[in-house]
């Protein structure tokens, strides 16, 4: 990563931190209100990052599922950073996004963005990738590990993993001296992580796919643990929509969620085809990734799973987790556990608002599940996604 890229990254991080404050969001919220008034029947406008987290949104567009529901959808907008995603969403340039689940907590309660989670976009789909010579988590002591953002499931999970292995997460300037039991967390764009690992600027990173698969493909890193093997069937990115659409356009909102739920179901049954349509040589060129790397995530060979079990990347084989999977229901127990863990996670910047959050209240207030429940029922219930017919569950951890 060149200096200009690094400066741009820091600028994006600072910009995102400024936007997700009540004062910083005000100008964009004014723009959102103006756009809503000027275009009350706006089409589906998706904003996304080129990661497999976005799969259902892109499949829904590619397969014409929005049109099949009777609503118009523009070509999804490829964005380059979470700062761009948030800015486009808060200002109303896009109206359907996938967003890191902890970022939705920050957006709604830290900056008062009037938006809600309407569904999960996927489960799992992330991993901790380390340098080839590292075989144990404890070996990361005294080194730096990259995360995509402070408000991410990656940050929450990796800090617990470190503590369980006798390591202390810290946040220090680059090249600062570290104690043998300290791990320095640095925020880095996913696309910069494999090169940084290859040049030994970092000892590892935890991030969404396909950047773990890419490190394997380039032979610059190995997967130490999959996040879904530490927090069973955890949400990573969720579907976030504006409250004014949910309240003023409920039929439209229902059709949006219907299309996304059907896209998830289609992807579960057509994993290889999904990898091809997302690839850089697909008709819509949604991502810059090769079909080979995406296949490794969406449709891995059975022999790869055996290798991960032998290496310890998978330690709970009985959970039968996919590398990435898809089910749309936002279980309240997950949101409660997430908020509880965020309170005890090292987060750089102003996070005082977390102290006053009641996990049970957030689970009810942040999420609007009326649409996704209807959508799930229309495709055969939760059993269509391989789940018991219950909208409650118990969170399972295995760090």
Predicted ranges, named:
Residues 18:
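Short, locally clustered residues in the helix-turn-helix/winged-helix DNA-binding domain
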Residues 335-399:
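Conserved C-terminal helix/tail region of periplasmic/extracytoplasmic solute-binding proteins
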Residues 25-28, 64-67, 167-169, 344-354:
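Short helix-capping/linker segments at secondary-structure and domain boundaries
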Residues 37-188, 196-216, 220-233, 369, ...:
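Short, glycine-/small- and polar/acidic-enriched structural segments
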Residues 249-357:
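Secondary-structure end/capping motifs
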Residues 1-12, 21-23, 27, 32:
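N-terminal secretory signal peptides
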Residues 101-103, 190-299:
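Pocket-lining segment of extracytoplasmic ligand-binding domains
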């Amino acid at each position: 990563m060149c200096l200009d890229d690094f400066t741009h990254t820091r600028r994006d991080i600072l910009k995102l931190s400024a936007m997700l404050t009540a004062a910083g969001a005000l100008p964009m919220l004014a723009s959102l209100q103006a756009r809503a008034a000027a275009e009350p029947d706006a089409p589906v406008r998706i904003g996304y990052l080129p990661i497999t987290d976005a799969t259902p949104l892109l499949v829904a567009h590619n397969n014409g599922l929005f049109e099949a529901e009777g609503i118009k959808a523009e070509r999804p907008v490829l964005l380059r950073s979470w700062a761009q995603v948030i800015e486009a969403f808060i200002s109303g340039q896009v109206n359907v996004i996938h967003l890191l689940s902890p970022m939705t907590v920050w957006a709604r309660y830290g900056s008062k963005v009037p938006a809600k989670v309407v569904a999960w976009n996927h489960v799992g789909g992330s991993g901790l990738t380390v340098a080839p010579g590292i075989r144990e988590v404890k070996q990361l002591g005294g080194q730096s590990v990259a995360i995509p953002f402070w408000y991410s499931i990656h940050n929450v999970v990796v800090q617990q993993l470190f503590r369980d292995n006798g390591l202390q997460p810290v946040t220090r300037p680059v090249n600062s001296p570290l104690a043998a039991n300290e791990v320095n967390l640095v925020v880095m764009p996913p696309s910069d992580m494999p090169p940084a690992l290859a040049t030994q600027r970092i000892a590892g990173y935890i991030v969404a796919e396909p950047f773990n698969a890419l490190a394997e493909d380039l032979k610059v890193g190995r997967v130490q643990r999959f996040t879904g093997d530490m927090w069973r069937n955890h949400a990573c990115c969720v579907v976030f929509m504006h409250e004014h659409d949910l309240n003023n356009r409920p039929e439209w909102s229902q059709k949006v969620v219907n299309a996304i739920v059907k896209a998830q179901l289609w992807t579960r049954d057509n994993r290889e085809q999904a990898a091809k349509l997302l690839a850089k040589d697909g008709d819509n060129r949604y991502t810059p990734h090769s079909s080979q790397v995406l296949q490794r995530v969406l449709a891995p060979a059975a022999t790869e799973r055996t290798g991960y079990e032998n290496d310890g990347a998978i330690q709970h084989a009985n959970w039968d987790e996919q590398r990435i999977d898809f089910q749309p229901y936002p279980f309240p127990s997950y949101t409660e556990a997430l908020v509880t863990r965020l309170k005890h996670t090292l987060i750089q910047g102003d996070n005082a608002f977390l102290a006053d959050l009641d996990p049970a209240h957030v689970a009810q207030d942040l999420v609007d599940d009326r649409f996704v429940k209807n959508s799930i029922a229309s495709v055969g219930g939760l059993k269509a996604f391989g789940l018991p017919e219950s909208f409650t569950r118990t969170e399972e951890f295995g760090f």
